[in-house]
């Protein structure tokens, strides 16, 4: 049945989502989570009819009765169809119990249940339940847990329908709510302009922290070891043009590491370049990291007060790296500044805010807060401490929040100056106490209605994380490229090039980019001279790219990190070998062709008929092997009777993944019981055929 979202219905009725949610709860007894929740289209039509005739009380009363009858009927139909039961309001508890009593053959179980508990609910002897499980090929002891699907199949044997317990259904609701939590409210009436979040990047000692220090009119630099930033700090600065939130990072590595975790919190990057030093290796890396993240760059040409300052030389070098200054006909804003004399600072802030204005940054301060973790740490006296950026909504002391896979209730909140505050709006950095564990930089946070909800959502997040780790997406590699890299409908191969001399870098970049075709786009994300470092691996991981090295090797730390992050590093001595490998990988990116490969044969020697399972074939493997995952053919007198899949494969009573030549096995075929002695079971699989370029 078609569904209607609450916010769509509220628009049709000319009411706010919140007002409609209250009406549904108070007048109809329908509980919905938020504006993204859905109800049946039939129910929506009835609600529209009732609200349009709200002046006629008698009519309204009749309609409510009719509506309640239809809801009751709907619930019964859903139960008959084994649709999972939704969370009910406490007021409907008695009504639910009466409905349960109407179904003698319906039981309610959780996502997992022990064999003993299932037998109790079915009111059957444990031995009978275990027997049915054995017929299904599941060997489970009395206290062993089985999943919902298996429980349903066992219950069906006893003519009992199974529905999932409300708590489990509620968890799925929570999961759905969690996934929708980042969607913005359709009603933009309460949205306001928010301050931009700016990250300051640049080469070491080019004056990043000094510049920010000058803007904030405070003294941070002196407190940090060696004058180099030791942590990720976030600061809000008030200017005449408005507020700006600055992230002072320990370099672009942190920026990219957070981007690799899906954290897109930076609106604008201020790239600091020393006027007397020009573009340096870390400056070049920072430029490439920003381009990979599609973040606009404002260049601050610092130290213009120094005798050796040469602004035009810096602009020339920027042009060589694709950043053409506005006064040279490009679109990159370049502002000469001096952190020491404070010259040009107002202009830098003005240009940054102007860049942000073009992006039309807005947020809704009235909604529940959400945002991103900048850093997390464990304080001996205060417990887990997290620095956050609020990206939407307003965060308040006492809010229950989920942060990544941890949760908690905010006990205290501090601003960037260490002052205790009670609330924080969009783009405001804060430090909070009250989490159950230390979150990681880049984790998303969300405010939820209570701590119980946060705890449940954290459990769901942990489950999802565990599942994602088990079936994690592999990083791109030359060996398996076609299924890994896609940019919309255009396939893309990202490459980071490192070489021993600059001439090799440029030659390799040009050669690789010429390999681009309509099917595959080759993009060199970053190219530089020197050994392959951890920074290269971090960028490759975040951009899902491969690293190609010419006459250079990865250092030990880079190799270890690449293995951990599953980043593919290839080193060569000859450029043509690399080009051939890239061509081969691009061929692999095209849709593969498959051929059939027979992996084994088995002869059916005995037939066993089991009422609850069907026909079990006792076989002897005559060649190759039979695997549980392979496709099979049943061949009788040289004629193929069936092509299908195995339902089970066993050695004695144990499930087997494969059975080799010379061994006996028992097997059943999915949806096929007409097996006869003397039949041949042929196992085969489809393998990819290497394509010619």
Swiss-Prot record:
The gene is infB. Residues 338-340 are annotated as: G5. The keyword Nucleotide-binding applies. Residues 202-209 are annotated as: G1. It is found in: Cytoplasm. GO terms for molecular function: GTP binding; GTPase activity; translation initiation factor activity. Belongs to the TRAFAC class translation factor GTPase superfamily. Classic translation factor GTPase family. IF-2 subfamily. PANTHER family: TR-TYPE G DOMAIN-CONTAINING PROTEIN, TRANSLATION INITIATION FACTOR IF-2-RELATED. HAMAP family: IF_2_B. This is Translation initiation factor IF-2. Residues 78-102 are annotated as: Disordered. Residues 92-102 have a biased composition (Acidic residues). One of its GO terms (cellular component) is cytosol. Residues 248-251 are annotated as: G3. Residues 302-305 are annotated as: G4. One of the essential components for the initiation of protein synthesis. Protects formylmethionyl-tRNA from spontaneous hydrolysis and promotes its binding to the 30S ribosomal subunits. Also involved in the hydrolysis of GTP during the formation of the 70S ribosomal complex. GTP binds at residues 202-209, 248-252, 302-305. Residues 193-362 form the tr-type G domain. It comes from Clostridium acetobutylicum (strain ATCC 824 / DSM 792 / JCM 1419 / IAM 19013 / LMG 5710 / NBRC 13948 / NRRL B-527 / VKM B-1787 / 2291 / W). Its main location: cytoplasm.
């Amino acid at each position: 049945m078609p569904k209607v979202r609450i916010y769509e219905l509220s628009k049709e009725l000319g009411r706010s989502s919140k007002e409609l949610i209250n009406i549904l709860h108070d007048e109809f007894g329908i509980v919905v989570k938020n504006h993204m929740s859905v109800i049946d289209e039939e129910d929506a039509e009835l609600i529209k009819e009732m609200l349009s005739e709200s002046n006629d009380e008698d009519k309204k009363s009749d309609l409510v009765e009719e509506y309640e009858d239809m809801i009751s009927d709907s619930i019964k139909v859903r139960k008959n169809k084994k649709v999972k039961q939704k969370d009910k309001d406490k007021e409907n508890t008695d009504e639910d119990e009466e409905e349960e009593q109407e179904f003698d053959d319906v039981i309610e179980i959780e996502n997992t249940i022990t064999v003993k508990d299932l037998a109790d609910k079915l009111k059957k002897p444990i031995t009978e339940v275990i027997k049915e499980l054995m017929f299904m090929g599941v060997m489970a002891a009395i206290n062993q847990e089985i999943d919902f699907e298996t429980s349903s199949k066992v219950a069906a044997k006893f003519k009992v329908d199974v529905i999932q317990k409300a708590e489990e259904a509620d968890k799925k609701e929570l999961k759905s709510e969690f996934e929708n939590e980042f969607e913005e409210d359709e009603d933009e009436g309460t949205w306001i302009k928010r301050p931009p979040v700016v990250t300051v990047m640049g080469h070491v000692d080019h004056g990043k922290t000094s510049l920010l220090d000058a803007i904030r009119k405070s003294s941070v630099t002196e407190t940090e070891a060696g004058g180099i930033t030791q942590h990720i700090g976030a600061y809000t600065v008030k200017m005449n043009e408005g507020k700006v939130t600055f992230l002072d990072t320990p370099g672009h590595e942190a920026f990219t590491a957070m981007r690799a975790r899906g954290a897109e919190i930076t609106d604008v990057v201020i790239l600091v370049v020393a006027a007397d030093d020009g573009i340096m290796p870390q400056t070049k890396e920072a430029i490439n990291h920003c381009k990979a993240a599609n973040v606009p760059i404002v260049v601050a040409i610092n130290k213009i007060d120094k005798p050796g300052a040469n602004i035009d030389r810096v602009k020339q070098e920027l042009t060589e790296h694709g950043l053409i200054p506005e006064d040279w006909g490009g679109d990159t804003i370049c502002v000469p500044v001096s952190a020491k004399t404070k010259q040009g600072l107002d202009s830098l802030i003005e240009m940054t805010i102007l860049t942000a204005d073009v992006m039309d940054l807005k947020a809704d301060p009235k909604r529940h807060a959400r945002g991103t973790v900048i850093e997390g740490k464990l304080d001996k006296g205060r417990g887990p401490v997290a620095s956050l950026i609020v990206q939407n909504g307003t965060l308040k002391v006492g809010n229950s929040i989920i942060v990544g896979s941890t949760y908690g209730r905010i006990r205290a909140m501090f601003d960037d100056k260490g002052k205790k505050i009670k609330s924080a709006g969009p783009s405001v950095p804060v430090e909070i106490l009250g989490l159950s564990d230390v979150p990681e930089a880049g984790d998303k946070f969300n405010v939820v209605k209570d701590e119980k909800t946060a705890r449940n959502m954290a459990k769901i997040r942990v489950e999802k994380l565990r599942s994602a780790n088990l079936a994690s997406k592999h990083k791109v590699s030359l060996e398996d490229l076609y299924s890994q890299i896609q940019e919309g409908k255009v396939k893309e191969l990202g490459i980071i090039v490192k070489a021993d001399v600059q001439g090799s870098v440029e030659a390799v970049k040009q050669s690789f980019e010429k390999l681009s075709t309509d099917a595959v786009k080759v993009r060199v994300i970053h190219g530089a001279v020197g050994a392959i470092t951890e920074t290269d691996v971090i960028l490759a991981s975040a951009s899902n790219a491969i690293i190609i090295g010419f006459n250079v090797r990865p250092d030990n730390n880079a190799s270890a990190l690449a293995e951990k992050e599953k980043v593919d590093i290839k080193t060569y001595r000859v450029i043509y070998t690399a080009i051939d490998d890239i061509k081969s990988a691009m061929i692999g990116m095209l849709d593969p062709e498959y051929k059939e490969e027979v992996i084994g044969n088995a002869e059916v020697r005995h037939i066993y008929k089991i009422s609850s399972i069907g026909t079990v074939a006792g076989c002897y493997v005559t060649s190759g092997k039979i695997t549980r995952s392979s496709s099979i053919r049943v061949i009788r007198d040289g004629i193929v009777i069936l092509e299908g899949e195995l339902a089970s494969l066993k050695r004695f009573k144990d499930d087997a993944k494969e059975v080799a030549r010379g061994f006996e096995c028992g097997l059943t075929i999915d949806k096929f019981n007409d097996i006869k002695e003397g039949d041949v079971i042929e196992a085969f699989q489809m393998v990819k055929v290497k394509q010619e370029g």
